From Swiss-Prot:
Changing residue 755 to T: In strain: E1a. Residues 25-60 are annotated as: Disordered. A motif (TonB C-terminal box) lies at residues 982-999. One of its GO terms (cellular component) is cell outer membrane. This is Hemoglobin and hemoglobin-haptoglobin-binding protein B. InterPro entries: Plug_dom, Plug_dom_sf, PT, TonB-dep_rcpt-like, TonB-dep_rcpt_b-brl, TonB_Hb/transfer/lactofer_rcpt, TonB_rcpt_b-brl_sf, TonB_rcpt_CS. Residues 212-999 form the TBDR beta-barrel domain. Changing residue 108 to K: In strain: E1a. Its main location: membrane. Keywords: Cell outer membrane, Membrane, Receptor, Repeat, Signal, TonB box, Transmembrane, Transmembrane beta strand, Transport. A motif (TonB box) lies at residues 66-73. Changing residue 689 to E: In strain: E1a.
Length: 999
């Protein structure tokens, strides 16, 4: 086992807990009976008893309902019970106590589990046991959630430029009844994707609230200073005769997470050196609705709607392609605006049967229709205001007054007179030097346009009654010296609107207008990743005995279809149009109006453009079929086994309809599978034909995978205070379509496809020793090892010369490809303990101590580090609860060790010809303190508050540090100096507070 070090305090806590438990007085009831609940049961099981009886049922039913509710309101079913091996359960009560507002808060005080950071797109799933994102399964009410485009090549090419919302969607905390976190291979529960572990969300139900009452009302309001987030949650539950209903609606409004020193950094600095977090306005809305009908106590029908939307709008001021002004007084050109969205909608119907038959005690059939859209939209335009944007710059202040062009105060235009240049027909002026109303001369800020290029909008200018306009007449056809001249206007009606132009076409006549275009050009891109899933589940349970062995059998199956597709849109248009902007395209020599197709110059205002939809991947339909069987066998009071088996059949089908499916860019598929004919690069028809042939070829490449998963857990209780648990399980993840087919060709970064990828396999072996006592608590130590086989990873394959399209010399291209690595291995140790101090002394009644510790180390292909492994982490806890729950607090101390350079790996080191393959920017060790408390002054009111990072420690987490990219335009810093890294630091001291009314 890899060596590890615990500090003195950790040893003290461990020894104290061990001694306390070992010498605790035995209770009257035996404590060594294994739980009848399996440790890795499937996620969508129905309850074992009907809990929908109205309140006028007999007292036994009421007691039964209350018992079920209590078991669901504490962590790990009972906080004094020993934990199940490699499993943590967070209930709604626990999440409320910890003031969790997002998925990151769920695992704040869990060791060995962190959240993947994704820059402006917040979080993207979890990291467990050395793997992250798609290798950690996430589901809500039995439904798999959206996966990222997981190929590392796609991430580096596109995610690093902020063009895709390539993240895993989250969940609204206020709708959750329970979060089950499992560490290690876990495909019995979730099928494909459960390599490092799983996170399973279960939403609330009306039955959770309607205990001995027919209604429940709750209103909660909270605020957090770390991101100025305020939230409101309204929960309504009611029962009427055979119907019950639950509604939970939550809205959240805040802004970006305030990094350490947020208020002290210069807000004007832009680009990768920016130290202050980029500004975003973040909103989240969620509604959970469940309506149930109970014709009898043994039958229950439920309609559910789970609606979730997360929106983030702001500016990427750290964007590296941002135009950098050399003079702060210059007008702004543009900046990058973001408008990202994650939207999930799940409509479900379920039927539950509680009639005991020879085949089941409970039966549940569920149909779900889930639609998830993750969108990243970027708009590049200037929003600095009319007087400060280059496109609408008007420093002279010209405006239209009573249909004529005037100065900013409505007076006539004035220019600097030329000395000794008076003519009989008027004064000569230098039209390059404009005199403002304050007598200051503004030079070279106006444009003199040819008559044929100038149109006046008659809705703004005076075009009636033989109207005239004052213009510039030059001494020559060039230069700025000239005199005023009043000329006639010619009226034209184009597309139903009246416009005027100067009648005299001489090249000495010029119109006088501001030099800017008079509008703000906007370049926009909108990228959608859609995952639509329809799923049918059948889940059954049956308790029975064979000889003297008790069985808790769970079995069933599922059938699902999922369509995953990418849609990209892009275009140009204009906004903030000013009076001097060209109002019409005009007409040609034959007196025919120009159109956007025939005009000789492009105008973003008059000819907004929307490009045809395109995609980098073909839509993929996935059909999944699975059956599972799980049995919890209780042999004796001292021995039990959990046996699980699952079979999955997964079928990938590319779906392409010519002319309907968004087109793939030619360069992505050109010559991919079917080579281009020789000397065809210069023949567009040949290239187009080859592109279509390759698309058709990909669309016919169906892939089928079959997988067998299993799990074995043994629970042995040799004494009343000692428990030994052994676990061996297998998980898998099938390659995604983008991992197999994605390709990209560029001299700096060329991705080669690999259609021969095998499924990833994970096998976990774990042993846990637990000392426990019903009154004292528990201490559990586990050793684990996970072996990954066929681990998919992106590697640098070297350089290859490709001939240029134009012929002649060749150019070296850096080649990358996804491959199955021979193996990857991870091992580690975890400690989880909680001791209740009331047995030591009466005055300590209600106090508890807790300690968690995780250390893990892993390598791929022998000696390549796994970057997703978290540094050594420990969490100390001191808690108190009043006997009547009038008030309480929790004090947490979290210590995280430094990320050692030898435990990191830069995949671009070889490409950059570096001998040091470690990642340059890593997290240092840190210790943070959190204090959380609650008080219940009256029965219906609960006030919660917390102080986080109590000592105002400056630190960066490893997940934030590893999100820094070595190239790209987003999430980058100046690599040579480290300027910009403060943007990634965690918040300093911050506070949370919430108030909840319940009736």
């Amino acid at each position: 086992m890899t060596n590890f070090r615990l500090n003195v305090l950790a040893y003290s806590v461990m020894l104290g807990l061990t001694a306390s438990v070992a010498y605790a007085e035995p209770t009257n009831q035996p404590t060594n009976q294994p739980t009848n609940q399996p440790t890795n049961q499937p996620t969508n099981q129905p309850t074992n008893q009907p809990t929908n009886q109205p309140t006028n049922q007999n007292s036994n039913a009421s007691e039964q309902l209350e018992q079920i509710n209590v078991s669901g309101s504490t962590e790990n079913t009972d906080t004094k019970a020993p934990p199940k091996i490699a499993e943590t359960v967070k209930t709604a009560k626990t999440l409320e106590r910890e003031q969790a507002d997002n998925i990151k808060d769920i695992v704040t005080y869990e060791t060995g589990v962190t959240v993947v950071e994704a820059g402006r797109l917040a979080q993207s799933g979890f990291a467990i046991r050395g793997v992250d994102e798609n290798r950690v399964a996430i589901n809500i009410d039995g439904l798999r959630q959206a996966e990222t485009l997981s190929t590392q090549g796609f991430k580096e090419l596109f995610e690093g430029y902020g063009n895709f919302n390539n993240t895993r969607n989250g969940a609204e905390i206020e709708t959750l009844k329970e979060v089950n976190i499992t560490k290690g291979a876990d495909s019995i529960k979730n099928g494909s994707g459960s390599l490092g572990g799983s996170v399973i969300y279960k939403t609330k139900d009306a039955r959770d609230y309607l205990i001995n009452k027919d209604y429940y009302v709750s209103y909660k309001k909270g605020y957090a200073t770390e991101n100025n987030q305020s939230f409101n949650t309204l929960t309504l539950a009611g029962r009427y005769k055979k119907f019950d209903v639950l509604v939970v609606t939550t809205s959240r409004n805040g802004h970006e997470l305030e990094n350490y020193g947020y208020k002290n950094y210069n807000d004007k600095i832009q680009g990768k050196k920016r130290e202050k977090a980029d500004p975003y306005k973040i909103e989240q809305d969620s509604t959970l609705l469940k309506l149930s009908f109970n014709p009898t106590e043994n039958h229950r029908f439920t309609f559910g709607a789970d609606l979730y939307e997360h929106r983030s709008r702001g500016q990427d001021l750290s964007y590296t392609l941002k135009y950098q002004k050399t003079d702060p007084n210059l007008a702004e050109v543009d900046s990058r605006h973001t408008n990202d969205k994650t939207k999930r909608r799940n409509i479900s119907f379920s039927y539950e049967n509680f009639s005991q038959t020879p085949f089941w005690d409970t039966l549940k059939i569920t149909y779900s229709d889930q639609r998830i859209k993750t969108r990243a939209r970027t708009d590049e335009y200037c929003d600095a205001g009319v007087r400060h944007c280059e496109g609408t710059d008007n420093p002279t202040g010209l405006k239209v007054t009573d249909g004529k062009i005037t100065r900013r105060d409505g007076s006539e235009l004035q220019f600097e007179k030329k000395n000794n240049t008076a003519h009989s027909n008027g004064e000569t002026y230098d039209f390059k030097k404009f005199i403002d109303t304050d007598k200051k001369v503004i030079e070279d800020k106006l444009t003199l346009k040819n008559p044929n290029d100038t149109w006046y909008d008659c809705s703004i200018f005076n075009c009636e009654n033989n109207a005239k306009i004052k213009v510039f007449e030059g001494n020559y056809s060039y230069g700025y010296d000239g005199k005023w001249k009043e000329v006639d206007l010619e009226i034209k009606t184009l597309n139903g609107k009246k416009f005027a132009k100067i009648k005299d076409p001489t090249n000495k006549i010029k119109s006088i207008l501001p030099s800017s275009p008079g509008y703000l050009e906007r370049l926009w891109q909108e990228r959608d990743l859609d995952t639509n899933t329809q799923q049918l589940n059948l889940d059954l349970t049956k308790d029975f005995k064979t000889w003297h062995i008790e069985h808790n059998l769970q079995y069933g199956g599922s059938y699902n279809t999922a369509m995953k597709r990418m849609v990209n849109r892009a275009g140009n248009d204009a906004s903030d149009v000013q009076w001097w902007a060209t109002p019409t395209l005009g007409y040609n020599f034959y007196d025919q109006p120009y159109t956007c197709a025939t005009a000789y110059s492009w105008n973003a205002n008059l000819c907004p453009r929307v490009d045809p939809e395109f995609s980098y991947l073909l839509p993929i339909k996935t059909t999944g079929k699975s059956v599972y069987l799980f049995d919890n066998l209780v042999i004796t009071d001292y021995l039990s086994f959990d046996l699980g088996y699952r079979y999955d059949n997964i079928h990938y089908q590319p779906k392409y309809k010519r002319g309907i499916t968004p087109k793939l860019p030619d360069d992505i598929v050109k010559g991919l599978f079917i080579p281009l004919p020789k000397n065809s690069n210069s023949k567009p028809d040949e290239v187009k034909k080859n592109v279509q042939q390759n698309i058709d070829y990909i669309a016919k490449q169906n892939k089928k995978y079959k997988a067998h998963s299993y799990s074995f857990v043994s629970t042995i209780d040799p004494t009343s205070f000692l428990r030994l648990q052994l676990k061996y399980s297998k998980g898998f993840r099938t390659p995604t379509s983008d991992e197999m087919y994605f390709t990209f060709k560029h001299p700096d970064f060329t991705i080669l496809p690999n259609a021969d990828l095998k499924p990833e396999i994970a096998k976990t072996k774990e042993i846990a020793f637990t000392l426990h006592n019903d009154d004292w608590g528990f201490i559990s130590t586990s050793l684990f090892k996970t072996n990954y086989k066929n681990f998919i990873d992106l590697i640098f394959k070297g350089e290859k010369d490709f001939p240029l399209v134009s012929g002649g010399s060749s150019l070296p291209f850096s080649l990358y490809q996804n491959i199955n690595r021979d193996n990857a291995s991870l091992k580690g140790i975890e400690i989880n303990s909680k001791v209740f101090l009331g047995k030591m002394a009466k005055f300590m009644d209600g106090f508890n101590l807790s300690y968690k510790y995780t250390y893990q180390k892993g390598r791929m292909n022998g000696n390549i580090p796994m970057n997703a492994i978290q540094p050594r982490t420990m969490v100390y806890g001191l808690g108190y609860d009043h006997p009547n729950h009038k008030f309480g607090f929790d004090f947490y101390t979290t210590h995280v060790a430094s990320k050692n350079p030898e435990d990191t790996y830069d995949i671009y080191a070889k490409d950059k010809k570096q001998t040091d393959t470690s990642i340059k920017w890593r997290s240092k060790s840190y210790t943070i303190l959190d204090l959380i408390g609650y008080v219940q002054p009256i029965k219906n009111l609960t006030i919660r508050a917390g102080v986080y990072n109590l000592t105002n420690r400056k630190y960066i987490t490893w997940d934030s540090a590893r999100s820094i990219r070595s190239f790209g335009t987003s999430n980058v810093i100046e690599q040579s100096t480290g300027l910009g890294i403060n943007r990634f630091y965690a918040p300093g001291r911050n506070y949370k507070m919430s108030v909840q009314f319940e009736f």
